[in-house]
């Protein structure tokens, strides 16, 4: 279709929308993917462009264009048109202007139907006729296209086409005027596009200061006035987008020089008034859509005034914002102000990258703090002022990523008034710094809270990296403690929260701070003077908060017990005291107890709880007699604190039924007392409300145990709490009074700005209330979801309500938009104890609790939802009737009715979801009552209520249906669905239809297994085509709900849906575009295009790989939908489109979508979100570019989701599409957003998928780690600089940064810091560097698996150590640990590598100093015990790795020696370097780390045979061994002491002699005990006396048995954990391999259990484990033999030995199943057995174990064992794998043959004879030569004598031939030597040698090879020597034999061997001269004698020895 004429396509089309969009999509894909444009491609682009022009001409003259009203298609067409111009403009420079001029003519309704060169007379005739046609200035598709494209052309080429502006202005205003004249001309989209064109011209012309001439301004001003007047009088509605663009257009006017000149004297006041009072002021911020455009416009105007024109200072700019903010009446303006502020900050940051440097952001914050003016503080509620603080918090969240660490640190120091290097000593600076400093004055407390909030953010972000100086840390700590104990309560509680974060970053000061506060409390409690409550409250609150979450490494158990004793002893004596000082002290003690309930130790809680329950019973169950209001109030406050303590306890313990019963009793009594109180006052009411709320919160903890038996009176109370229509009807009311039926009381509220306004009755109206209570609406309701409270322990259903639209949080400004609809502020000071009892937040969205009335409503609803599902049906029915009375009461206000309806529906909805999750049933009558109640609720146009009602209908039908059988269930569902289908058909009201269609969808959703999909589908499908926007959008949403639960969809339905989705997407009668204002506005919030995208996405998931089976037209429709949504400039659509692509990519369907396009779009979203701002382009700029500084509204959420997509593409191995282009961008994201899990995952996958083929990964990471931010952002800043220049914003003083095309910033040859001079030299923030460090560690650990990568990394050892040093020097635990892990990696992997320049030395020897330097910072002040423990481990690795002798590693070895000294005084602290350890737990952690380190060094010194290291460690064995033994004993005592849950600490001083929970100690021993066992095993094996010095024999045996048991227990507990088993099994081997007898192991029960464990390990483990098991089983066999040394004892428990041998046999049989006695296998079966090299090694080891053990067994036992083993060997000889396996069993075979032949028992010989008989056929005919020779040699050389003469002859031939074969010659030669040595031991061998020698003679005569003959000669000589040595009588014969062979030898090889023969003869003569003479003279033949003589004569001559006689004389031994 791409090559077809577009005009012809449309002329012949039956579906214009589909065919036009398909043509556009096809060509868009083509143009976007063009890389280098050659001539042919240029012509193709030109052709596309021409066809587009032709198409526009064609439709401009069409009469009927109704089916071409396709604005969404025209957006895609505009993209194609603009891209084609970009591709052509270099080749055809005039194409930009010509195209714009042509489109201008179309818009101006000029005749464009015929080109000048067209000669067609018919066309000329048409032209003539049309030239007289009157211009209508109304909408037409051609003009819509022209206008749309012109907007984009001006955004891209504005300066090139500015001459067309007058024509366009004229056309724009004439068209707008005409359109607005009559409703029939009205076209919402076209008039918006016209105004967008006007604004695009204003923004992008090259003469912006004069562009808005007076005449044009007058037209525009008039238009604006007309529009706003019409809105004001409700005369006419306009598209909100149109109004937004109208407001944008005003920006150009305010930026013009004339305007500025005219208002130069009052420019600030003018801007202020225009944005608060005039047209913009009234309408700009009020609407959710226009607000963001108004915010952008204000920011751009002020940016122009400040940055471009310098007419305002920055301080004046902020003052304008403050003034607007303070003088507004609604939250809309407040949010808009901060949205504008952030946009302005980022515009300035782009223009000046130093805009936020140093403390400039703090200046901004303090300038904006003017919103806390004295008037505001005095006249606004706490609710409002708290919201002001949240605006600042949101601003910090957005801006903080762009601040570097030094700027953050500087601002923190300024706020806290630190006397650091940042502070100057000059007077001017001191005065300046004073303005930053924080104080605690009542009149400035809100400013102080603002500073505290910022401090919290900074400290949380900086972690511990800023705490480098001890003085500074103490200064900050003291300042925070001062603030935390000041007079102002709000400041106190906020400061404590900061102090907690600060001290968790500097935990070494935790204990000291708590001690100081406890000391202060103790002093004041004892003092008789005035008790200063605020100061002591601060100290108590500090202690309580610091205990929560603190590590026991820093807070000792002893300190916890002191605090416990302090608080409980006071309460015990003053439980209910209300006298002044005792009351206050009691409250503080309860606060301490609340904090103590958070101490992380279950055993501690168990110890304290009896006493606490006593307190609670005394306080809560007894009726208190009071005399006045003050006494009652104080008692209620004490009760409240006691209840909070109970709540905190329940949050930290395991609740059981008995405990729930106890607590429930307490609560009932407490509640009864509250209801008995008649005294009425504001204070008492408030205290009672807090009490009731706390009671409900405690009930929430018990809900699991009380839900089926809930207190009915309490149930009535909680229902009234959230549904009583008589509550909250006015500004405020006394809830407690109403609960007691005592009437309502009103309280005025200055923030209630809307009390006199007639408001729409909807949730939206409630959410926009300013009165702080929103008519009793729950804070759980947010408008689009129902949130759960964090304190509820019940089921959490965090799924959005059915029918919810995608979240708006893709837009960065959504955090401010949420504030617009958040009427109730969470405030810490209203319930400061939440810091202690809370789990980190009040709810899923709020950190703190709201006011107590709202919190009571929330708790009541949460408790109701948890209890209602489990009540019986009668109670449920009764409750629903009560709720109906409340919901439909006429005696209340409309807004209160809405609030009640929302609360009830939300509570019911959560209850029904719990029923759904737990598969609970609901009685039919109850269910029907609820359904009818829901239907009766009015407020039909309220979206939230409609959605939740519809979802409840679905949940209700499911709950009722569960009571029915399958058949009845289907019938019931059919009935219900038909009711709603009938309602849809009968009712025309759109909102009612919306409710019914959503109800239909939810019925299917929750009953999909039983409902008929087609029935629901058909109805909803028909409704989708309803043109009413409400019905259309919600029907689509209902279809989406339907499809999400229909998991299998047929292709026909999928095709129908996709075709329909395309149709609904492109046609202007549906969706966001078109004539109707109502439809356009409604679709701003409920965009049907978004729903279409969701449906399409769901189809990609459901249809999956079957997508490929759809026909071409449907696939075209799908492609059209995805690409249209991708380029729609709507982030939701773009993300949905990209997720559709993600699904397609996951299924690897590459032919459906163009991957490159979607990845470009993904990258564009990521890039546009680096800087936060509001987009200024009306079109997606991914493929066209833009001249705007911020063209697209940034979306960090969208960016992170696109990182997730790219991560997935790595997993799918599609990185070639994006990896190179994303490299620089991803590094920048890592620099800015290190907290993002998506970014971290991206880098992890990137490395994991590329590190094998990219050897430069370490270089990249190392480079980025050391890179400055300036260098990192250099090319990005260069691009921004170019944009600034285009927009005329680049100041003359700026110098352009020169650079080449952007290349990888991680290039090894990157710029140095000096190269990047003038740029920001600040390093990446510490979090980014921590991630890089972690990535380096990951790279190292992954490289360990690949030898080549490990070798490649060896070239980077110096850099690895350097990066380790960089990490270990940062004051952050994570970075220190990672640095040490990298160092450990280097030591473990490279210590054995030799230095190529000094081969004898380790490659690490030269790095010794650097290694030490990287290690020692771990012992600097502030290092955690965890860091120091691991550093000690690394120090041990340095020593053990043998990079240098210990004496040359002075600092390291001395460190370990010094650490041993700490064991001398158990009561003192430990000092390591600058670090001091004081708490017992931390101290023990270090001590165990020291012992663990020494254990490692000792083991390695023994196993590595390192003499120097052994000598070094040996000196300390006498110290270490007792310490290891003691530690292991301690471990076992802690672990197995069942008498109590606590252990007495043996060596503590009396002062510290307090019981310490077992759990706090046992965790210390778990990681190290195994290493102690291994070390003791090694030392035991090396020198048993060292251990015997500490333990006697009996103790040692018992101790070793305990160690053995521990190892077995660890194995059993971790039977499925390979890593644990690989640690434990070597330790077990070390324990067993000692030479000691451990008798206990072989007791019946124990050995049985041991065998069972071994069996399981063999059956489930891998080969590595089995290798170790062979050693262990062998150890046990040896141990059995030692423990049963006598024959009697040996045989007594022989079955145990059998079991151990069976285990070995099991290992063999698993690999050789054919050896099993009862298994019959054929050779074919054998072939199926796969034996790996690992199996071969394991078999070899197992057979060796057999061989090494059998000799030690009793003879009686051996027979059975021999039989078994011979059977196995025989099976092996017969199997098909014999050639591989036989070499393994030969040593065992040899041992067996030797043992059997040497046995005196004839049975053994027979046994061997039978064996030989069974395998001799295999030996002689089937074995290969090597195994054959080896087998024969084993039989012969070990004395097997049952061979026949024929077999002996055959053996002689085989072995003789083996000598001739190079492959078998070594084996044969060695075998012959052994045979010769045994010829007199085994007589048969003499005969055998006779045969062999005979064969030798034959071989010589047949010209054997010289080398073989030489070997045989030597064997004959050896034979003769052995004969002479053993039997002298045969000496002459044996010498004669040799001489005969020499003669034959000489005859065969003549002169070649004369010297060799002569040497042999001389050697024979030496053996026995007389026998030699006798042989010469009388035995050998004359011929042989002659030969010998001639050889010797020749030898004598050659050696010049004289005569032969002389030669023999010389050589003789005489």
From Swiss-Prot:
<dbReference type="InterPro" id="IPR040108">
    <property type="entry name" value="Laa1/Sip1/HEATR5"/>
</dbReference>
<keyword id="KW-0653">Protein transport</keyword>
<dbReference type="GO" id="GO:0006897">
    <property type="term" value="P:endocytosis"/>
</dbReference>
<keyword id="KW-0333">Golgi apparatus</keyword>
<dbReference type="GO" id="GO:0015031">
    <property type="term" value="P:protein transport"/>
</dbReference>
<dbReference type="GO" id="GO:0008104">
    <property type="term" value="P:protein localization"/>
</dbReference>
<dbReference type="GO" id="GO:0030139">
    <property type="term" value="C:endocytic vesicle"/>
</dbReference>
<dbReference type="GO" id="GO:0042147">
    <property type="term" value="P:retrograde transport, endosome to Golgi"/>
</dbReference>
<dbReference type="GO" id="GO:0005829">
    <property type="term" value="C:cytosol"/>
</dbReference>
<keyword id="KW-0968">Cytoplasmic vesicle</keyword>
<dbReference type="InterPro" id="IPR016024">
    <property type="entry name" value="ARM-type_fold"/>
</dbReference>
<keyword id="KW-0813">Transport</keyword>
<protein>
    <recommendedName>
        <fullName>AP-1 accessory protein LAA1</fullName>
    </recommendedName>
</protein>
<comment type="subunit">
    <text>Interacts with the clathrin-associated adapter complex AP-1. Interacts directly with LAA2.</text>
</comment>
<dbReference type="InterPro" id="IPR046837">
    <property type="entry name" value="Laa1/Sip1/HEATR5-like_HEAT"/>
</dbReference>
<dbReference type="Pfam" id="PF20210">
    <property type="entry name" value="Laa1_Sip1_HTR5"/>
</dbReference>
<comment type="function">
    <text>Involved in localization of clathrin adapter protein complex-1 (AP-1) and subsequent AP-1-mediated clathrin-coated vesicle cargo loading. In complex with LAA2, cooperates with the small GTPase ARF1 and the phosphatidyl-inositol-4-phosphate (PI4P) synthesis to confer temporal specificity to AP-1 recruitment.</text>
</comment>
<dbReference type="GO" id="GO:0005794">
    <property type="term" value="C:Golgi apparatus"/>
</dbReference>
<dbReference type="GO" id="GO:0035653">
    <property type="term" value="P:clathrin-coated vesicle cargo loading, AP-1-mediated"/>
</dbReference>
<dbReference type="GO" id="GO:0030136">
    <property type="term" value="C:clathrin-coated vesicle"/>
</dbReference>
